[in-house]
């Protein structure tokens, strides 16, 4: 199958090209060409007042469309989450489980493994957020399940989760270096979060190889004059990346903008999205612009990656090109996946076509 798409601009992930056509054969980028260079039998699909950009990547969300994965623990909830992601221009996602019972974690691993083996596209793997976090910074997590990591538990999750668990959020002050190294040696991306670490503790974790932090500012020790905390350590270490939530509730837009100035290419977006549910360990209540637990504790967002992009440009004041990179190029870089987040000749591509004026999704190649 051969297709050609013409918009005002194509953002490849590296550069912005004007007036050129994206030519695709069998879902592989055949080239980015001048309109007159196309084969004569190709009909060009035209999208005026739009631009083409790589599809988005979300490394942290818990469910969608009424299905919370940690409660349902079935492939149907992964399908529902995938559908939710696609409505916001996101073609790749990391399903996330907050602090939970070992039984549920193991069931989640089994289900994600089954889904990955089915050949369905979109799911990158499982992100375990907890249980090895600091109860002082638990946020909406269930304190009864929070613990320091017994080695036998770590080894069990690593054994069962091989090739399935791709990311773990933990509090470095709760974990021995040996445990952190053990997890990283299994090829799992370790992210520091839900942590009350001092600046020294956080900096040490980054120095021994922890490459990232989870939802900057939220559930972490703040930056203060006499104690820079984890936020200060993240700002200070030029090798560390961090996710951030951009909807004005979890983090003020000015803080997003300031952090972008401080961190540049090291900052990327997640949605942290949950869905309404009244059963199970995590009961999320929709409050219009956020989700909370029944007691009012902030528990997640109602964002898509598309609405995140729009907020970044219109409310945080970050340039469109950088906002696009924060939704695609930079998380792909953290994953060290050269095939994600860019439009390149010879590669399979997922892309969005977005209205330049409204920043609304017009077309996605992966629906």
Question: What do these predicted regions represent?
Answer:
Residues 1-38, 358, 364-365:
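N-terminal metal-binding scaffold of metallo-dependent hydrolase/deaminase domains
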Residues 155-276:
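Active-site core of metal-dependent hydrolases
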Residues 128, 183, 213, 312, ...:
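Conserved, mostly hydrophobic/aromatic
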Residues 83-94, 134-162, 204-216, 220, ...:
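Active-site gating loops and adjacent loop-to-helix segments of metal-dependent hydrolytic enzymes
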Residues 229-242, 260-347, 351-354:
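His/Asp/Glu-enriched, well-ordered alpha-helical/loop segment
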Residues 61-66, 79-108, 121-134, 161-175, ...:
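Divalent metal-dependent hydrolysis catalytic cores, especially in the metallo-beta-lactamase
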């Amino acid at each position: 199958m051969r297709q050609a798409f013409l918009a005002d601009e194509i953002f490849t992930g590296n550069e912005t090209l004007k007036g050129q056509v994206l030519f695709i054969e069998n879902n592989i980028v055949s080239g980015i060409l001048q309109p007159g260079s196309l084969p004569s039998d190709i009909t060009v699909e035209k999208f005026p007042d739009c631009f083409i950009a790589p599809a988005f990547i979300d490394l942290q969300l818990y469910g969608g469309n009424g299905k919370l994965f940690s409660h349902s623990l079935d492939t149907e909830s992964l399908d529902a989450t995938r559908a939710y992601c696609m409505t916001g221009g996101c073609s790749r996602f990391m399903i996330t489980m907050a602090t939970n019972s070992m039984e549920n974690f193991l069931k989640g691993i089994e289900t994600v493994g089954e889904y990955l083996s089915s050949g369905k596209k979109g799911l990158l793997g499982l992100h375990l957020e907890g249980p090895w976090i600091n109860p002082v910074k638990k946020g909406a997590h269930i304190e009864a399940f929070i613990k320091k990591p017994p080695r036998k538990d770590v080894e069990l999750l690593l054994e069962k989760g091989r090739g399935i668990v791709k990311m773990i959020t933990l509090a470095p002050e709760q974990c021995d270096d040996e445990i952190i190294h053990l997890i990283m040696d299994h090829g799992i991306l370790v992210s520091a979060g839900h942590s009350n670490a001092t600046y020294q503790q956080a900096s040490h974790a980054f120095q021994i190889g922890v490459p990232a932090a989870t939802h900057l500012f939220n559930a972490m020790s703040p930056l203060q004059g006499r104690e820079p905390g984890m936020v200060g350590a993240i700002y200070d270490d030029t090798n560390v990346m961090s996710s951030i939530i951009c909807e004005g509730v979890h983090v003020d837009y000015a803080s997003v903008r300031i952090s972008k100035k401080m961190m540049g290419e090291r900052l990327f977006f997640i949605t942290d999205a949950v869905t309404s549910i009244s059963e199970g360990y995590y009961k999320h209540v929709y409050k219009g612009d956020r989700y909370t637990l029944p007691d009012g504790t902030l528990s997640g967002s109602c964002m898509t990656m598309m609405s995140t992009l729009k907020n970044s440009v219109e409310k945080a004041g970050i340039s469109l090109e950088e906002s696009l990179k924060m939704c695609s190029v930079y998380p792909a870089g953290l994953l060290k996946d050269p095939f994600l987040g860019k439009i390149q000749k010879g590669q399979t591509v997922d892309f969005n076509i977005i209205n330049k004026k409204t920043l609304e999704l017009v077309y996605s190649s992966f629906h």
